[in-house]
């Protein structure tokens, strides 16, 4: 079945999102635009003999996710996995240990960037830099830096500027979490109270701003205008993504496209552009820059899709934050949008943002009774397969294979 899936994938020119913007361009890349959707229809029509020209967006996505429903049965991989063979035949422990070699002292170095004289502001700004996070983004960035350097000139050395990108990515991500918690009025994250819960909303906004300013200073210190342009695009995307999340669409077809665009801007853009930034610093080849970007984008979208699945399938203790949180915020994520196809009565709840008493519980039950979780997981698998296809274009190395393994971990994580 797996080989059949790969034959189908190779024969399909579908790219789940638009190609990356060039240096300095506004970069309005978003997942699965109209031209890509049209190409998918044409490809599937040729291969299946079906007329898909009139299939609306969400049904097209659902058709693709159900085309090979049993693919990608990936065995679970944990950080404690013993040494194993990589795709290139070399041994390593696991991607996190491999990536962490270049990230020792990560959070200490971030705290040094936060040069603050006011003790309260310092405490707020350093609150999430306690070393207890997953450090998923810095790990990907460090591995991508080595993979690109090896591909370019067989150098296993990570430049100081590339390591700085890993720090900056984590700082931008953390600042966005602080601001998101204010907007969502969240009370817990990573198993502890949020900054806004402890210090209040006004001070939390300022703490997030301070982290962003420190990240901007660190970015300017690198001195590469192309890299600066790439990463400042991330900050714009974060803001635009939050605005997209605050809005909604009445049309079902527009609703799913809206959701995927929001997912790209709020989550995937940071990973994609951070990967691209380290590739620019380590290799002059634009083809490599595009590979790095596409890998990060596809893994980032898959990561958020699985996060949306876990909101329905994991308990609060596992997630470190309340489950069904998205429904309580009035958000219709992938599992909800797919479930709505089986239970059209959910449309009214989506439009009123689950605001009536009992809406959240009813919507959750509809999702669990439907194949919404399964279909969202299948869609995440497709994005991860695309990420693997992209990164496999680089020269074989332990770091490249670790990035392949990371894309598989994204699908099997439970928190």
Swiss-Prot record:
Mg(2+) 2 binds at residues 180, 184. It comes from the Eukaryota. Its cofactor is Mg(2+). Mg(2+) 1 binds at residues 180, 184. Its EC number is 2.5.1.91. InterPro entries: Isoprenoid_synthase_dom_sf, Polyprenyl_synt, Polyprenyl_synt_CS. The keyword Magnesium applies. GO terms for biological process: isoprenoid biosynthetic process; ubiquinone biosynthetic process. Keywords: Disease variant, Isoprene biosynthesis, Lipid metabolism, Magnesium, Metal-binding, Mitochondrion, Primary mitochondrial disease, Transferase, Ubiquinone biosynthesis. Pfam families: polyprenyl_synt. It is found in: Mitochondrion. GO terms for molecular function: all-trans-decaprenyl-diphosphate synthase activity; all-trans-nonaprenyl-diphosphate synthase (geranyl-diphosphate specific) activity; metal ion binding; prenyltransferase activity; protein heterodimerization activity. GO terms for cellular component: heterotetrameric polyprenyl diphosphate synthase complex; mitochondrial matrix; mitochondrion; polyprenyl diphosphate synthase complex; ubiquinone biosynthesis complex. Isopentenyl diphosphate binds at residues 134, 137, 173, 190. The keyword Magnesium applies. Belongs to the FPP/GGPP synthase family. It is linked to Coenzyme Q10 deficiency, primary, 2: An autosomal recessive multisystem disorder characterized by early-onset deafness, optic atrophy, mild intellectual disability, peripheral neuropathy, obesity, livedo reticularis, and cardiac valvulopathy. This is All trans-polyprenyl-diphosphate synthase PDSS1.
């Amino acid at each position: 079945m797996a080989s059949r899936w790969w034959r189908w994938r190779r024969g399909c020119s579908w790219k789940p999102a638009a190609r990356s913007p060039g240096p300095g361009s506004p970069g309005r890349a978003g997942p699965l635009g109209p031209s890509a959707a049209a190409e998918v229809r044409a490809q599937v029509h040729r291969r299946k003999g079906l007329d898909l020209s009139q299939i609306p967006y969400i049904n097209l996505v659902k058709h693709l996710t159900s085309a090979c429903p049993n693919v990608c049965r990936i065995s679970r991989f944990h950080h404690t996995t013993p040494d194993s063979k990589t795709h290139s035949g070399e041994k390593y422990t696991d991607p996190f240990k491999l990536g962490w070699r270049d990230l020792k002292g990560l959070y200490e170095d971030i705290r040094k960037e936060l040069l603050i004289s006011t003790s309260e502001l310092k405490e707020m700004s350093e609150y999430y830099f306690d070393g207890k996070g997953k450090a998923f983004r810095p790990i990907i960035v460090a591995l991508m830096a080595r993979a690109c350097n090896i591909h370019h000139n067989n150098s296993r050395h990570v430049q100081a500027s590339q390591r700085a990108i890993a720090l900056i990515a984590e700082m931008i991500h953390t600042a966005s979490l602080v601001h998101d918690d204010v907007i969502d009025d969240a009370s817990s994250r990573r198993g502890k109270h949020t900054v806004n819960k402890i210090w209040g909303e006004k001070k939390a906004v300022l703490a997030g701003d301070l982290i962003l300013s420190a990240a901007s200073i660190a970015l300017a210190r690198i001195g590469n205008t192309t890299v600066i342009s790439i990463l400042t695009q991330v900050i714009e995307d974060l803001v635009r993504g939050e605005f997209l999340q605050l809005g909604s669409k009445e049309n079902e077809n527009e609703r799913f496209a809206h959701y995927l665009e929001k997912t790209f801007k709020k989550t995937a853009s940071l990973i994609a552009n951070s990967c691209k930034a380290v590739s620019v610093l380590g290799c002059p080849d634009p083809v490599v820059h595009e590979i790095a970007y596409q890998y990060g984008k596809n893994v980032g979208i898959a990561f958020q899709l699985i996060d949306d699945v876990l909101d329905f399938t994991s308990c609060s203790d596992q997630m470190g934050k309340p489950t069904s949180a998205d429904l309580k915020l009035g958000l219709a994520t992938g599992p909800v949008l797919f479930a709505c196809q089986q239970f059209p009565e959910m449309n009214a709840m989506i439009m009123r943002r689950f605001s009536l008493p009992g809406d959240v519980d009813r919507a959750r039950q509809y999702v669990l009774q439907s194949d919404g979780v399964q279909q969202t997981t299948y869609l995440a698998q497709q994005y991860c397969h695309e990420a693997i296809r992209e990164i496999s274009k680089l020269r074989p190395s332990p770091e490249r294979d670790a990035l392949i393994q990371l894309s598989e971990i994204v699908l099997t994580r439970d928190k």
